Amino acid sequence: SVHRFFRTFAKNQEYNMRIGIIVAMDKELRQLLALLSDTIEEKSGGKTFYRGRMSDDKELVIQQCGIGKVNAAIGAVEMINAYHPDSIISSGVAGGATTLVPRFHVVASTDVVYHDVYCFSDNAYGQIQGMPERFAADRKMLEIASKIENVHPGTIASGDWFVDTKGKAGEILDHFPEALAIDM
């Protein structure tokens, strides 16, 4: 579960840094706030941040950004400007793309691909012109996350439209059969 993931991650002595977490929805925010102690609600740049401690004095800053890649990017920039975290984790609910990952397990991205982008044949499907095909995860964080029970490292396909049918999921998996999870 996400609780076990963040508790275990925060206890890891190899990673003694300030971690920022961005989430899209209120339900995701409430789950994470339940893990913090000494929580302080702060406002910066018109945004609300929650700063607190989890396990052994590890400081976390959490923000609910709203749904979509643009909101996540804006939230990450606001968090960087206000708190200067060493790392930012985007956390949230995603659809399972394979039966290899049981329900309620965590997928830690090795890389993220866009499932809703096509910039013609000069680029790979999902690649924005001038950008990489895939966005790689931080190797040190991935190494730590991979040691946690019920965490599965793999590709996450992310986009800005809700994948609400098996047909849509199938189209995404036609392009990215290695994906373990589909975001939105």
Predicted regions and their residues:
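Short, Lys/Arg-enriched N-terminal segments with co-localized hydrophobic residues
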Residues: 3-16
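N-terminal short beta-loop-beta anion/metal-coordinating cradle
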Residues: 17-77, 83
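Generic structural signal for well-ordered, non-membrane alpha-helical segments
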Residues: 21-25, 29, 69-72, 134-142, ...
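Short pre-catalytic strand/loop immediately N-terminal to key active-site residues, enriched for Gly-Thr
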Residues: 61, 176-182
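Alpha-helix C-terminal capping segments
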Residues: 78-82, 98-101
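Proline-aspartate-enriched helix->loop->beta-strand connector
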Residues: 84-89
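Mid-sequence, gly/pro-rich, charge-dense loop/helix-turn segments that line enzyme active sites
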Residues: 97-177
